[in-house]
């Protein structure tokens, strides 16, 4: 049986061709044996602008809104028409028994193929290649277990729903606000609420009025303790004068044992956040780099929203850990079949174990090292520590000192690769300090501070805010989806910058 394969981009098509034996280069496709492999160029077909539905929409008028297409039109951009014609000819050919959708295994990949397939008027039966790695073995296994294309009808429906909602809100909202305010205002389903979060935070910062407060700090026998905040400076002066040069007593010592589990593996958003935090990479930079690593067969599918692996991947991860660290740790900590969605968490591939990685560029090396580090960190023991709160009494006034004892470093013992390590501000509890201990003489000093405004968003914190937006309004985890998807949040942030909104 002869079959046609359509990938999302040329580089992926070449990787697939090597596995299934399509080596002969033709115009717009590769051929060999019983298969032909071609590719899309990203979104070849997209929904038409309003003027393609009616000439009158070329002029923006408030009275024409809302624009609600009765029948949606897909258009191929001029620069992609030549390649679309090649795909249409292949999809209409009677030489093939079926076509394999080998676009990215996700919602947008499904839409990219289905739109081209529909516009071409193809009647070929569709099979689906669904893989989480570009390794040769993964591609071969995927072709050995192709799915029926109809199993992904709901995924395509979800993509169409998203695309049409974006069109309706974007086209109508942009025209409405532009006409209302007399200058171009772009509106987007995800873009606008994200901008609203930024605006709300910026307003809080700009309108914040800092207010002074005062504390009194007493020092003696190596102990530094401080009072509560005081609004009135004269109150602080009174406390300082009363305690300076006096004796103090350790009133109580409260210990709280705490445990912090190892972090989960990377999904795309968490990787983008930490790459921004440690290296200053933008979300778009990180997505571009990890996508290239994926296409080079060094990491698994990057556009995932899962931070776990499935049970059948335990041995693979064990092999990876043996190679990269020699210590396996507790792999079961990251195994959860129920929390793996379309794809498991981002991992290095087994192929990466065989490759010479010294040739990776600086940025690629950092992202790859970060993924390996997170895999190693995720199987480490918990970080266990003890918070100690010491109350010191002086002249009938209470002061507190805070200490932290690290009982087990666990996953925190692994330094972030290629990043300057933060110096800990924690102070260990003095071993000889006991309840009732007398401090013969303390010095007291008044300290002034100021209340702080909310911090401006970084890409790290904004991505987190987008991911968790609306969570308080929903009880079920299935309803907590936030703003955007791991694959689209970077583009939204880029849009806000390019439009001059931030």
Show which residues each predicted segment covers.
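Intrinsically disordered, low-complexity regulatory segments
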Residues: 1-163, 167, 173, 453
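Hydrophobic (often cysteine-bearing) scaffold residues that line and stabilize catalytic clefts
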Residues: 12, 109-112, 157, 161, ...
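Long, highly charged, low-complexity internal segments
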Residues: 36, 45-77, 89, 185-291, ...
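Short glycine-centered, acidic/aromatic-flanked micro-motifs in structured strand/loop junctions
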Residues: 103-105, 273, 303
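Short, intrinsically disordered, charge-balanced linker/junction segments flanking boundaries
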Residues: 216, 500-502
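Extended, well-ordered alpha-helical scaffold/bundle regions in very large, multi-domain proteins
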Residues: 281-341, 502
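Acidic, turn-prone loop/beta-hairpin segments
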Residues: 333-359
């Amino acid at each position: 049986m002869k079959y046609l394969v359509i990938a999302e981009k040329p580089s992926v098509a070449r990787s697939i061709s090597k596995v299934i034996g399509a080596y002969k280069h033709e115009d717009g496709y590769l051929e060999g044996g019983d298969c032909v492999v071609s590719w899309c160029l990203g979104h070849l077909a997209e929904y038409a602008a309003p003027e393609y539905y009616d000439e009158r929409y070329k002029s923006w008028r408030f009275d024409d809104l809302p624009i609600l297409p009765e029948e949606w039109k897909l258009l191929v951009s001029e620069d992609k028409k030549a390649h679309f014609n090649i795909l249409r000819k292949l999809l209409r050919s009677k030489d093939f028994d079926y076509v394999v959708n080998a676009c990215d295994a996700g919602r947008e990949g499904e839409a990219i193929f289905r739109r081209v397939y529909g516009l071409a008027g193809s009647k070929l039966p569709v099979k689906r290649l669904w893989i989480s790695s570009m390794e040769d073995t993964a591609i071969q296994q995927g072709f050995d277990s192709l799915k029926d294309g109809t199993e992904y009808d709901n995924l395509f429906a979800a993509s169409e729903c998203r695309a049409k909602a974006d069109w309706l809100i974007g086209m109508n909202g942009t025209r409405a606000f532009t006409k209302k305010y007399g200058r171009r205002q772009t509106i987007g389903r995800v873009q606008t609420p994200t901008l609203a979060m930024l605006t709300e935070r910026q307003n809080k910062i700009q309108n914040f009025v800092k207010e002074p407060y005062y504390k009194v700090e007493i020092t003696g026998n190596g102990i530094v303790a401080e009072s509560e905040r005081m609004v009135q400076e004269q109150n602080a002066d009174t406390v300082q004068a009363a305690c300076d040069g006096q004796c103090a007593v350790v009133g109580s010592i409260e210990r709280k044992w705490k445990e912090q589990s190892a972090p989960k593996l990377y999904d795309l958003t968490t990787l983008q956040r930490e790459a921004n935090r440690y290296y200053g990479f933008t979300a778009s930079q990180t997505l571009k780099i990890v996508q290239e690593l994926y296409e080079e067969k060094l990491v698994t599918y990057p556009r995932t929203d899962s931070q776990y692996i499935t049970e059948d991947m335990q041995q693979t991860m064990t092999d990876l850990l043996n190679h990269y660290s020699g210590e396996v740790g507790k792999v079961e900590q990251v195994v959860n079949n129920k929390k793996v969605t379309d794809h498991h968490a981002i991992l290095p591939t087994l192929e990466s174990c065989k490759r010479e990685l010294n040739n990776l560029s600086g940025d690629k090396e950092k992202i790859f090292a970060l993924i390996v580090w997170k895999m190693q960190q995720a199987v480490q023991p918990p970080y266990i520590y003890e918070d100690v709160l010491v109350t010191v009494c002086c002249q009938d006034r209470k002061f507190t000192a805070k200490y932290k004892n690290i009982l087990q470093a666990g996953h925190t013992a692994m330094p972030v690769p290629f990043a300057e390590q933060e110096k800990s501000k924690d102070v260990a509890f003095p071993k000889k300090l006991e309840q009732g201990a007398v401090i013969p003489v303390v010095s007291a000093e008044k300290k002034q501070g100021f209340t702080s405004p909310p911090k401006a968003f970084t890409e790290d914190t904004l991505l987190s805010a987008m991911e968790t937006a609306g969570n308080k309004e929903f009880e079920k985890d299935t309803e907590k989806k936030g703003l955007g998807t791991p694959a689209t949040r970077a583009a939204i942030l880029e849009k806000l910058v390019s439009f001059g909104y931030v």
